[in-house]
């Protein structure tokens, strides 16, 4: 059975609504790396990074492939680049005017 757009959007945006996951994506956009390298680069425990990459891999936001003993993580730019461009465009166009997108509540 095909999932509704509401369900799909909820799952994707829930997976992205986490500062650690966004930091992971930002780090990996230009430089694929292993979980260990990523944990070091972000100053996080490897277990925390592993916990946060699992849902990103399940939604195909990240991909993983093996190089020797390492699992190398890569950002799926086919989905992430246009999504981040749309978010950035929205923030530039509407947030300075409305001021609500960037305010913390």
Question: At which residue positions do the language-model features occur?
Answer:
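Generic alpha-helical secondary structure signal
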Residues: 14-17, 55, 88, 94
């Amino acid at each position: 059975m095909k999932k509704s757009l509401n369900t799909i959007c909820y799952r994707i945006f829930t997976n992205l609504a986490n500062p650690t996951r966004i930091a992971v994506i930002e780090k990996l956009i230009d430089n694929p790396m292993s979980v260990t390298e990523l944990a070091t680069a972000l100053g996080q425990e490897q277990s925390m990074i592993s916990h946060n990459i699992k849902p990103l891999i399940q939604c195909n936001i990240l991909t993983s492939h093996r190089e020797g003993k390492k699992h190398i993580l890569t950002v799926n730019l086919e989905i992430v680049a246009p999504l981040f461009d749309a978010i950035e465009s929205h923030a530039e166009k509407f947030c300075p005017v409305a001021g609500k997108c960037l305010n913390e509540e």
